[in-house]
UniProtKB/Swiss-Prot annotation:
Its main location: cytoplasm. It catalyses: S-adenosyl-L-methionine + a thiopurine = S-adenosyl-L-homocysteine + a thiopurine S-methylether. It comes from Panthera tigris (Tiger). One of its GO terms (cellular component) is cytoplasm. PROSITE patterns: SAM_MT_TPMT. This is Thiopurine S-methyltransferase. One of its GO terms (biological process) is methylation. InterPro entries: SAM-dependent_MTases_sf, Thiopurine_S-MeTrfase, TPMT. Its EC number is 2.1.1.67. Keywords: Acetylation, Cytoplasm, Methyltransferase, Phosphoprotein, S-adenosyl-L-methionine, Transferase. Substrate binds at F40. S-adenosyl-L-methionine binds at residues 29-40, 69, 90, 152. The gene is TPMT.
Length: 245
């Protein structure tokens, strides 16, 4: 695993047993949206994505970009405005509707026949499709393959016991020559139960190392006042670029 040169020294906790049995239900995630407890949403978009956008897109046009656990990420419109095709999956219908409303995009909705109770929301322009369903049900629907995956707030939100299954689904969606941008968080997992969950380097290597080249692009101190209520005194975001071996 290559590492970016950085002045930030992050302690790695090899023993993540403390979080391994932590489980959040889909209903709990829906409730977070209803209650407005969405501190993970970034109204201005993700700054590290902006900084490394050229590395991610590599100058290519008309790419298919996948957003796992997309919420109402403003970056979806960034990519659509650049002519790319965006597909996301999100359990909260409220989050999806807020995305289209806040981005002033008209849309349609239709049921997903393969998944009872699920829906897909499509922009009138046709290049944004957001699936409202459990991500782990997604393999039942043929959503095609993707050139790019932007994984921010997804791997860190998946229950730790589901990470292998999650990773298998993500990699099954990739096209040849894919580029997968992954943002994870480092903090002391003995002080905060998650989510977002702590994902150490060793876990990334274990999940992706057999099929992907793993390169750490940057590490950034993202500690804010709100993090004090988590009981932690530091939190570092790491951005990885995963490419096909």
């Amino acid at each position: 695993m290559d590492d970016a040169s950085t002045l930030i020294d992050v302690k790695e906790y090899s023993d993540t047993e403390v979080q391994k049995n932590r489980v959040l239900t889909l209903e709990e995630w829906r409730e977070k949206w209803v209650d407005g407890k969405i501190g993970f949403h970034q109204e201005q978009g993700h700054q590290l994505l902006k900084k490394h956008l050229d590395t991610f897109l590599k100058g290519e046009n008309v790419l298919r970009v996948f957003f796992p656990l997309c919420g109402k990420a403003v970056e979806m419109k960034w990519f659509a405005d650049r002519g790319h095709c965006v597909v996301g999956v999100e359990i909260s219908e409220l989050g999806i509707r807020e995305f289209f409303t806040e981005q002033n995009l008209s849309y349609s909705e239709e049921p997903i026949m393969e998944i009872p109770g699920a829906k897909v929301f499509k922009s009138s322009s046709g290049n944004i499709s957001l699936y409202c369903c459990n991500l782990f049900d997604l393999p039942r629907v043929n959503i095609g393959k993707f050139d790019r995956i932007w994984d921010r707030g997804a791997l860190v939100a998946v229950n730790p016991g589901d990470r292998k299954c999650y990773t298998d689904i993500m990699l099954s969606l990739t096209r040849k020559g894919f580029r997968y941008l992954l943002a994870v968080l480092s903090y002391d997992p003995t002080k905060h139960p998650g989510p977002p969950f702590y994902v150490p380097d060793a876990e990334i290597k274990n999940l992706f190392g057999s099929t992907c080249n793993i390169h750490c692009l940057e590490k950034v101190d993202v500690f804010e006042e709100r993090h004090k209520s988590w009981g932690i005194d530091y939190i570092v975001e790491k951005l990885y670029l995963l490419t096909e071996k």
